[in-house]
Amino acid sequence: MKTIVVCSGGLDSVSLAHKMAAEQQLIGLVSFDYGQRHRKELDFAARCAARLAVPHHIIDIAAIGGHLSGSALTDNVEVPDGHYAEETMKATVVPNRNAIMLAIAFGLAAAQKADAVAVAVHGGDHFIYPDCRPGFIDAFQRMQNAALDGYASVRLLAPYVDVSKAAIVADGEKHATPFAETWSCYKGGRLHCGRCGTCVERREAFHLAGISDPTDYEDRDFWKAAVSQYSAKEVR
């Protein structure tokens, strides 16, 4: 299938891009500048596209992101430290982010006669992000079937939606993903901070997968305390 990958430049979506390059006909990556404080992730998406020799489109929706106030990713709100599944991480929710991005990606796919859009939502996202859950993925596919009825048929591929980030690390290793060429940290500093939810999740995933983590963290050990102290109930 001719497939476009929504790629932020993070570990999950870059691993997905390498997976799709191996298993499907990858025809491009699409990324979004929504005014995120960790915009440097887009540089890693560009490197991924160059590495896989496919076109890379960066869609500027910063004007929209500016109206989605109250998120630590787009507003003057501190990025919390701690486990990625804790209630405090709701500060990192950008309302309707995936719905907005996927709607644009599907329009792009239809215009380019692509067969599928692939997105790297995963099981670890279910706790906090409603637009990463299986119910959302299924509902979005139904909506797009109606939106493109008679014009195009585009599938939404979410191969990681029911698996852990550790499983993504293992899959990325299988498909030769250069993990050092990915960016996760929400704070967007020179190095991964090692303390925000996505850094904790990244560090834990490599540990659980039994794969060496090449990432340079400002705080390499905080994740252990964060993981030992959290409790959260998954929502699907």
From Swiss-Prot:
Recorded metabolic or biological pathway in which this protein acts: Purine metabolism; 7-cyano-7-deazaguanine biosynthesis
One annotated GO molecular function: ligase activity, forming carbon-nitrogen bonds
Keyword Nucleotide-binding: yes
Matching SUPFAM superfamilies: Adenine nucleotide alpha hydrolases-like
Keyword vocabulary terms for this entry: ATP-binding, Ligase, Metal-binding, Nucleotide-binding, Queuosine biosynthesis, Zinc
Domain of life: Bacteria
Cofactor: how bound: Binds 1 zinc ion per subunit.
GO biological process, one term: queuosine biosynthetic process
CDD domains registered for this protein in UniProt: QueC-like (cd01995)
The UniProt record lists the keyword ATP-binding: yes
Positions contributing to Zn(2+) binding: C185, C193, C196, C199
Reaction catalysis annotation: 7-carboxy-7-deazaguanine + NH4(+) + ATP = 7-cyano-7-deazaguanine + ADP + phosphate + H2O + H(+)
Needed cofactors: Zn(2+)
Residues that coordinate or bind ATP: C7, S8, G9, G10, L11, D12, S13, V14, S15, L16, A17
Pfam families the UniProt entry points to: QueC
E.C. number(s) listed in UniProt: 6.3.4.20
General function of this protein: Catalyzes the ATP-dependent conversion of 7-carboxy-7-deazaguanine (CDG) to 7-cyano-7-deazaguanine (preQ(0)).
Family classification: Belongs to the QueC family.
Protein name: 7-cyano-7-deazaguanine synthase
Biological source species: Rhizobium etli (strain CIAT 652)
Encoding gene (name): queC
